[in-house]
Amino acid sequence: MCSFFLVLLLWQNMAVPPTYADLGKSARDVFTKGYGFGLIKLDLKTKSENGLEFTSSGSANTETTKVNGSLETKYRWTEYGLTFTEKWNTDNTLGTEITVEDQLARGLKLTFDSSFSPNTGKKNAKIKTGYKREHINLGCDVDFDIAGPSIRGALVLGYEGWLAGYQMNFETSKSRVTQSNFAVGYKTDEFQLHTNVNDGTEFGGSIYQKVNKKLETAVNLAWTAGNSNTRFGIAAKYQVDPDACFSAKVNNSSLIGLGYTQTLKPGIKLTLSALLDGKNVNAGGHKLGLGLEFQA
């Protein structure tokens, strides 16, 4: 009897692999989070007593002076595994999303996503399905377009830290596969390796290393078949203290990104960032960014 419960416990603790879109995510986060070049951004997140979540975001591009904004409300009906989401942005696009998870079957997630633009009359609807269990993560999305539905499928298998994934897109209007991607990787709590091939022409790879509790590093590499130009970058994130972190990255084009995030007080976070051209430091044209995030 004891051995039965031990086997059951080990089985339940087996890792569920990430979705195909999340493969290599840790390395991407080191390269992207904590930066906002050329933007002045304001984010506000609040949650009411009944569980209704409000998220609003606004940004201004310092070069084009264009202002963008969005508003999102989300309500979770935990008892029935339901999540209702309403979205709006300054392009006057309205969106509705309904998700049900772990109700029809354990690990199964169903989402109905629709959007409508009153200005153009454009409508869009998607049905997304996802299923995850030990060693496997499946996804299938159907995008209903005027030209004809398109089907995107993805599969990720995992075993003892090793990951292998495949993603494809089939357009019914063309009756052919228009995208075919493959990825292989290895993942532990402190180290991640990710490689991918997109459509047999684009190749990429990344390495993520958590050196210690304060320091995270990442390297990425990409190139295209028939093009000798290889894209290369390194990045690091250092947690100075519980309320502050510093980020830096550089690529083979000598573009240097710097970011600093400071928690001013609980629920208020300030982010400063700069993008410098290492080849023309004195020429100007560098980009600065400022972000404020409020959460209550």
From Swiss-Prot:
Distribution of this protein across tissues and organs: High levels of expression detected in heart, kidney, brain, and skeletal muscle. Not expressed in testis.
Keyword Ion transport: yes
PROSITE patterns: EUKARYOTIC_PORIN
Residue ranges crossing the lipid bilayer per the database entry: 39-46, 52-61, 67-77, 82-89, 93-101, 108-117, 123-132, 136-145, 149-158, 162-171, 178-188, 191-198, 202-211, 215-223, 230-239, 244-251, 255-264, 268-276, 286-296
Alphabetical list of CDD domains matching this protein: Porin3_VDAC (cd07306)
Cross-link (Glycyl lysine isopeptide (Lys-Gly) (interchain with G-Cter in ubiquitin)): 25, 33, 66, 122-123, 174, 279, 287
The UniProt record lists the keyword Transmembrane helix: no
Regulation (activators, inhibitors): Inhibited by nitric oxide.
Amino-acid positions noted as binding ATP in the UniProt annotation, renumbered to this chain: 25, 33
Keywords for this protein: Acetylation, Apoptosis, ATP-binding, Cell membrane, Ion transport, Isopeptide bond, Lipid transport, Lipid-binding, Membrane, Mitochondrion, Mitochondrion outer membrane, NAD, Nucleotide-binding, Phosphoprotein, Porin, Transmembrane, Transmembrane beta strand, Transport, Ubl conjugation
GO molecular function: ATP binding; ceramide binding; cholesterol binding; identical protein binding; oxysterol binding; phosphatidylcholine binding; porin activity; protein kinase binding
N6-acetyllysine: modified positions: 33, 122, 265, 279
PTM notes: Phosphorylation at Ser-206 by NEK1 promotes the closed conformational state preventing excessive mitochondrial membrane permeability and subsequent apoptotic cell death after injury. Phosphorylation by the AKT-GSK3B axis stabilizes the protein probably by preventing ubiquitin-mediated proteasomal degradation.
Residue list for modification N6-succinyllysine: 33
Purpose: Non-selective voltage-gated ion channel that mediates the transport of anions and cations through the mitochondrion outer membrane and plasma membrane. The channel at the outer mitochondrial membrane allows diffusion of small hydrophilic molecules; in the plasma membrane it is involved in cell volume regulation and apoptosis. It adopts an open conformation at low or zero membrane potential and a closed conformation at potentials above 30-40 mV. The open state has a weak anion selectivity whereas the closed state is cation-selective.
Entry's free-text remark on domains: Consists mainly of a membrane-spanning beta-barrel formed by 19 beta-strands. The helical N-terminus folds back into the pore opening and plays a role in voltage-gated channel activity.
Protein name listed in UniProt: Non-selective voltage-gated ion channel VDAC1
Lineage: Eukaryota, Metazoa, Chordata, Craniata, Vertebrata
